[in-house]
Structure formats: structure tokens, C-alpha cells
Amino acid sequence: TLFVVGFGVGPMAFAPLSEIFGRRILYASTLLIAVVFIVPCAVAQNIGTLLVCRLIDGIAFSAPMTLVGGTLADLWRNEERGVPMAAFSSAPFIGPAVGPLVGGFLSDALGWRWLYWIQLCLSAFCWLLITFTVRETYAPTILARRAKQMRKELSSDRYVTEMELDERPLGQRLRIFLLRPFQLLFIEPIVLFISLYMSVLYGLL
């Protein structure tokens, strides 16, 4: 489906962007877009509306899935990361297996539109929770904000971070960050094989 296509394309951009702008802003903005575009799916009167909105939802919903791994790396040290990463890694396998089963019963009982209304409620709750309770976890972004605050409070330009000293234009930095996932995909065999396995898994389910 187009949702799965969007789900596969989105991470190529969102993961690198989180290293420039931070995790929190991407969580909040992409989840908001996803929540908004669930509504047209629920009230769609033609297949075109449904396809376009599902594609946008797939792209937007891929961001949290992509960023959680980085967020866990921000929060736990290498030796403490095993259990959180294992719990997170199981979600992509459990979700596609359980989701169609539950969704099938709900669709028969309430109608297919109610699947989107239920998804809207759950997604809106997650957006509110993340937007208003989750803090920034990416260290360079946190340090940049602290340095900016210290410059303002102390009226001194001596407080800068390594990220701020990077004088490369934003376009050049974006190009490097956005190309990196594709380089890993085609150069690193383990990344390529896992990606092929996951694509077959999602295609079958």
C-alpha cells in the first residue's frame, strides 16, 4: 500500500534531520501532520483522497518509528541499552501481526471508517503526551540551546558549541545528512539484508 511506501521513504529524511534540528521538534511536527491527515481518511468519499492521505500518513508516522532508536541511544549508555532496544525492536514485528487481527474484528463490528476514528484518538493522545511531556534528548541540540541562553544572560559570545562552529551552509549539511542513509543502505550488507527482510515482511502482512 501507499502507507507502507511512505513508511519506507520517510526515515531516509527524518533520521538525518533529527541530527540537525533535534528529536523533539520532529516528533511533535510529524505526529501532528499524521493526526491531521487521519481525518480525511475517515471521511473520504473517493479512493483518490484515501490514497493521498494514506501516503502522507505513512511518511509522517515513520518519523517516530525512526527516531525512537536514536532517542534510546540518547537516554541509555551502551551497556544499559539492551533491554530498551529489545523492547522497541519487537514492536515492528508484533504490531503488523496483531494489528490486522484486531482491525478485522473492529471493522466487522463498527465499519472501516471507525478504524480511522480510533486511530485518530490514539494518535492525538500520543501527540499531546509527546509534545507536552517529552523533552529534547539529542545532546548537541541541548548544548546549543544552553549556549544560546548563556550568551543572552551573560551578554557574551564566548559560549558556543561544536555544532555552531560548523560553518558549512545548511544546504551542504542537509545534503550530507540526507545522502548518508542511502550510502549505508547500498554499502553496508547488514543494512541491505535487514531492509530486504523487513520489506518482504511488511509486503506479506
Regions found by a protein language model. Name each.
Residues T1-L205:
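A six-helix transmembrane bundle that forms the core substrate pathway of small-molecule transporters
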